[in-house]
UniProtKB/Swiss-Prot annotation:
Any one GO BP annotation for this protein: nucleotide metabolic process
A GO term for molecular function: metal ion binding
Organism annotation: Salmonella schwarzengrund (strain CVM19633)
Signal peptide (UniProt feature, chain positions): none
Chain sites annotated for binding substrate: T8, T9, N10, P11, A12, K13
Organism classification: Bacteria, Pseudomonadati, Pseudomonadota, Gammaproteobacteria, Enterobacterales
Disulphide bonds in the chain: none
The name this protein goes by in its record: Inosine/xanthosine triphosphatase
E.C. code: 3.6.1.73
Amino acid sequence: MHQVISATTNPAKIQAILQAFEEIFGEGSCHITPVAVESGVPEQPFGSEETRAGARNRVDNARRLHPQADFWVAIEAGIDDDATFSWVVIDNGVQRGEARSATLPLPAVILDRVHQGKALGPVMSQYTGIDEIGRKEGAIGVFTAGKLTRSSVYYQAVILALSPFHNAVYR
């Protein structure tokens, strides 16, 4: 059984990690241990590079806390131009897989508040009245009318980031 350290305690992210690992390695093939670690970037990262750095930092910090694990996984959400997206970073001590998620264009009313210094999650919670929406369906669920959720979009990115770990051509 793979010991997977999730560099987040966010249920939407943990669900995506668990589903993706079970899709690739089989049901019941892993145990997820969530840990809260620092990203080393602002609460609301801007741009692809800052967001990617946050995910990489979380993986490195989780690895320092739990060096005995088989995998360390981080999902860092950010804002790039007028959209939200995330970077997924997965490390197994030998190699690293990274993938960027799909992007969701955000309406100006939301972006204006984010550019004023507020994180997307609290802005969306205030907009929708849903407490801690970032730990649930997120802006993705709201603006796709539930057709996608934060977790479903992250799931795809985790699957992509896992590609180097089950395809020999990457080694």
